[in-house]
A protein has these predicted regions:
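Sec/Tat signal peptide C-region and signal peptidase I cleavage site
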Residues: 19-28
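Bacterial N-terminal signal peptides
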Residues: 8-20
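Mobile, glycine-rich extracellular loop/lid and propeptide segments
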Residues: 31, 54, 63, 69-611
Length: 611
């Protein structure tokens, strides 16, 4: 609660920053209020374009995620001086994406493709060696010699001693395969683990330790009434850290793709997550009350196949989710809205009167053998393999959702744009969205198209709820992996992407794209699993590679002709988290955090001297 009021106090300054000229630094209030910030997978999928006016922005201050994005994107302009007094950040040459540290999480450990670490910053105005941390799940079965989740602190160059150090590491009694989510103050973690083959929600309070490691974690599965250990749901709120509580999903399903999405709105304390049986679950009392799964009409029936990670939009009241294609029943590759609040109830989108728990699905967006249920007919091949569909990106301000499909059933990779308003005139039952944009060829072997990201032209667009800018995505899933730019004009998506350049000389999978803006440079980061780009700056021959590109800072600017920086990584990377929250002044850096897909390591890499 204290951190919420800190964020609320910060919003006036943050809103002022939003309309400040880029060329003139804005100083925060002299009396410094500590603002903590959590960043996890969900902040990549729920975004906000710039509101149309100051007054509209002030109305958005009731949405904690909007404020978090303001802080995350504007904090580089709030440094209290222009020096680097502690030597935290060292200038590096342009093009040098330096691996600051890598840590083994155990043999075979990985976050997994399309999954993310989670970062907590104790104070967005300064680095904190003791309290800033980044958490990784390992994707391995927990045991006395293998952590299922591990966090690192002492993260930064200049912290002294061992960089980093293990902050805490736990044997939680299961296998965590999807991204974790953090409470707003960073003191708790929520995640899904497979426990005896069944999906289980875990809510955990951590405690810093000097003795735990990836190979010697603390076992907190022993039954307890007060902690440390596993406590009942009723005893969780009062338990002493480290402690956790577990809730088995209703129906005993599995969950291999869906990560939990937490609603930070005051008074909500609700979390949503999907399962492999096509149901969407709601949990209440997660970080502030008594954790419990909601009953009827939850879990909501969306489909009969695996769900992606859900994204809740507080404006429309809908939870948006995608379904992956499953060949066993010729189903999936759809986008769906599930009504979660009274805001979306009572209308008819072609499937009867919507109530809380009602799902409104699109037609099939990918390959299928049944043309009558598909947006593009049976088209090209690809209907004989399963196809994962990533979680959508939702721009709550603009009222649009973006869905990324590696095969649209007609021979192309595609990005679909949908309205977040569910009714017969916008997103209707069994519709195909407002626009379909193609980004190269479509995979017939099940290579997914992971989510892209918008550039700062889009995020800072002055056109309010009708933003103009660009969406970058790594497509061409049936050929050499290729970076594309998709133009968005007044909230309308172009129907085809502009080819930027090939990022691999092979038919390989890209990671999601992650954008990071500074006062003078807008960068995007992505990785390929093999045969990375060979132009300047070149990736190691034949290897997986993470790379950055300098993208135009103005509409219609010159597209990059090569990478800005590269780093060889084993088998490519997970999703990438950007840490733009430490601002020493004119010397600043972008930390990126990720895991390798085959090298068993957690990595922090930095690129400084951006100005």
């Amino acid at each position: 609660m204290k951190n919420w009021f800190g964020l609320a106090a910060y919003v006036t300054v943050a809103v002022a920053l939003l309309w400040a000229p880029r060329s003139e630094p804005v100083r925060a209030q002299e009396s410094h209020t500590r603002i903590s910030l959590s960043s996890d997978w969900s902040h990549h999928h729920m975004v906000f374009s710039r509101p149309a006016s100051w007054t509209e922005a002030l109305r958005w201050q009731q949405n904690p995620r909007y404020i978090q994005q303001l802080v995350r994107r504007n904090v580089w302009r709030t440094g209290e001086n222009g020096t680097d007094p502690y030597g935290w950040f060292l200038r590096r040459g342009e093009g040098e994406l330096k691996r600051d540290w890598s840590q083994s999480m155990g043999s075979g450990a990985t976050l997994g493709a399309g999954q993310y670490p989670a970062k907590f910053s104790f104070d967005v105005k300064s680095a904190n060696c003791n309290s800033d941390f980044v958490a990784f799940h390992t994707g391995l079965a927990a045991s006395t010699s293998q952590a299922s989740i591990i966090a690192y602190s002492n993260l930064y160059v200049g912290c002294g001693g061992s960089v980093p150090t293990v902050y805490w590491a736990y044997d939680t009694g299961g296998t965590i395969s999807t991204s974790v989510t953090l409470s707003q103050d960073g003191s708790q973690v929520a995640f899904v683990q497979a426990q005896a083959g069944v999906a289980t929600l875990v809510v955990l309070k951590w405690k810093a330790s000097a003795s735990e490691t990836a190979s010697a974690p603390l076992k907190i599965t022993n039954a307890s009434t007060t902690g440390p250990g596993t406590v009942s749901n009723a005893n969780y709120r009062a338990c002493t850290a480290p402690c956790m509580t577990t809730i088995t999903f209703n129906g005993n399903p599995t969950d291999t793709l869906s990560a939990p999405y937490y609603d930070f709105t005051r008074g909500s304390d609700v979390l949503y997550v999907g399962d492999d049986a096509g149901k969407l679950h709601e949990f209440t009392g997660v970080f502030s009350g008594t954790p419990a799964e909601s009953g009827s009409p939850w879990p909501a029936i969306v489909a009969s196949v695996k769900l992606s990670s859900p994204v809740y939009d507080s404006v429309s009241g809908n939870v948006f989710v995608t379904t992956s294609r499953q060949t066993s029943n010729n189903s999936g590759a759809r986008f769906a809205a599930v009504c979660a609040t009274s805001a979306c109830a009572g209308v008819n989108a072609g499937n009867g009167t919507i109530a809380i728990g009602t799902a409104t699905p699109s037609l099939v967006l990918g390959p299928t053998s049944t043309s009558t249920v598909a947006c593009n007919g049976t088209g090209a091949s690809g209907d004989t393999v399963d196809l994962r569909v990533d979680a959508p990106i939702v721009d709550s301000t603009a009222g649009k959702a973006y869905v990324f499909v590696g095969n649209n059933g007609n021979g192309s990779s595609a990005v679909y744009q949908f309205s977040t308003t569910v009714d017969s005139n916008h997103f209707a039952f069994h519709s195909c969205g407002a626009t379909q944009a193609t980004v190269g060829t479509g995979s017939t072997t099940g290579i997914p198209l992971f989510s892209g990201d918008f550039d700062n032209v889009y995020y800072s667009s002055a056109s309010g709820a009708s933003p103009t800018g660009n969406l970058y995505v790594c497509g061409n899933t049936s050929g050499n992996a290729t970076l594309y730019q998709l133009r968005i004009t007044s909230d309308a998506l172009a129907t085809s992407g502009t080819l930027v350049l090939a990022v691999s000389s092979a038919n390989t999978t890209c990671s999601p794209v992650t954008e990071s803006d500074t006062s003078s440079t807008d960068r995007i980061f992505l990785s390929v699993q093999a045969n990375g780009a060979t132009g300047a700056v070149a990736c190691p021959v034949g290897a997986g590679c993470v790379m950055s590109f300098n993208v135009p800072t103005t509409l219609g600017g010159t597209l990059p002709t090569g990478t800005a920086a590269t780093l060889g990584v084993s088998g490519g990377t997970s999703g990438i988290i950007i840490d733009n929250n430490v601002v020493p002044g004119t010397l600043r850096t972008s930390e990126i955090y990720f895991s390798t897909l085959t090298g068993s390591t957690a990595i922090q890499a930095s690129q400084a001297g951006l100005q």
